[in-house]
Amino acid sequence: ECGIAEQDMVSQAGSFATEGYIPIVHSFSSFLTSRPNEQIYNNSTENTKIIYSGFLAGLLPGGPGHSHQAVRDIASMSGINNLEMIQPNSEKQVKEFLNYSIKSPNNIYLRFCSIPFELPDKFDELSKLKKGHGNTISDGEELCIMTYSPILLNEICKSKKLLLENNINPKVISMPWLNVFDNNWIIKELNNLHLIIVEDHYVEGGFAEKISLAISRLDIDIKIDVIALEEVPKSGTNQEVLDYHGLSSEKIKEKILSLIQP
């Protein structure tokens, strides 16, 4: 860490990496992925190995305002070659993905939610680290809701309970890999489903665009809809912000019903 000097920090990390070290660069996601983007790109083109750790990623917390809400970080890091983007969803996954990141030959961006959140029952038991694979948290039929955010995963699981009252039983998938996808897994888990992607990032340049591109290259039948940010994020309490942007459990349920009902 170098305080609020992310460009210097990333440049120093590049120097350490040329000497054989594996630096872990840490800052708030909104600043880490934007201010030193040039230095991150240069490090990557020089084939140096660095792990970038971004905290406060996504829409929440809602209090600090949009300068601190990292809702374009995935887009900002998309043009970096040899970079894998991952969002761990639990303490267990943090350890697993940090070990993976150290062993991987590629640069890594670890996207962290660093506010308290709840996870579905038996989440860690259901979650296995396999490159490019998501984890099915709850089985369902015809409809699949996918996210990478632990906060949104909790909201989606609550939405599923509300949807069951309408005789709609969606599959729920947690997908920690943001730009690496296994084609065989996609075919096995998503073929012939209506996929609804929920993310705490702008629609443009986010996870949905990446997995949609991967799906478009396969000979499979998947309808895709996206629930994500479409305007500059508002500030307020966490619940107010989720409600406003349609990412609370009730709002997700309402949006899904509007997408699937004629």
Predicted region positions:
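Thiamine diphosphate
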Residues: 61-64, 111-262
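Conserved thiamine diphosphate
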Residues: 5, 15-144, 153-154, 170
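Short pre-catalytic strand/loop immediately N-terminal to key active-site residues, enriched for Gly-Thr
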Residues: 1
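Short alpha-helical basic/polar micro-motif
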Residues: 11, 75, 250
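Glycine-rich oxoanion-binding loops at beta->alpha junctions
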Residues: 4-6, 10
